[in-house]
Amino acid sequence: RGVVPRFSDLDVIALSLTAEHLGIDSENNLFDRLKEYQKDFRHIISRRQFNDRRKNTYQLCEMIRKRIAKAMDGAEEYFCVDSKPIEVCRLSRGKRCKMGKNEPDKSPAFGYCATQGVYYYGYKLHAVCGLRGVIHSFDLTAANVHDIHYMKDVKFEFSECSILADRAYLSAELQQDLFSSAHIKLEVPYRLNMKTWKPAFKPYAKARKRIETCFSQLCDHLMLIRNYAKQTTGLFARITAKISTFTVLQYINYINDRPLGHVKYALN
């Protein structure tokens, strides 16, 4: 294994999450600030080493995040699913963007966001959260991947539960597949022009807004849509750090018997 570094992987993750909570999304800015606290960080690594090790430890960070989420919300039977556009550059610069050129299977793409009515170049963040707002699973796909394709992977992580979704996930074939393979009941509102139209169940419609609130908090407090990454691995690591920070702040509220959604005031 080689020499064990004094600045451990957990230290790298902790520093990354702390920077995200403080709104420091520039590594140069972070290490300029750390110069004032050299006595407290005797084994601090260089900025380049931190950048490399944060990319190498984002899977460990996600594994820890899932365990924390399960500790808070492990017995949940109802979940919400939705997607959020992640723009990597302006639409006019999409063809010149070099992100993912060496990894075609992970490269961004042109896509359309129906809720905002805009075209963009980048990725799409898919997430599944419980009714209390705890994100249990998420993934990044190219912007041109339909939301339904993400649901085909959900059946390997969830079972015997109900998932509330919007009309983008409406598919009789998908609903049947999820129920037959993992006993997942996908609740999707009907379209107005459908012959079998039925009014939406109001409690489900209200509960489905929970994940929209999570996305709003991630964008507001943790600046989810701000991106300075040059490569796909760096972007994935940053997204993982932001969502992990969100989960840790919820956990701090959880152990202090405070509302999980008050993430801005978790450390007050």
What are these regions (language model features)?
Residues 1-268:
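Short alpha-helical elements
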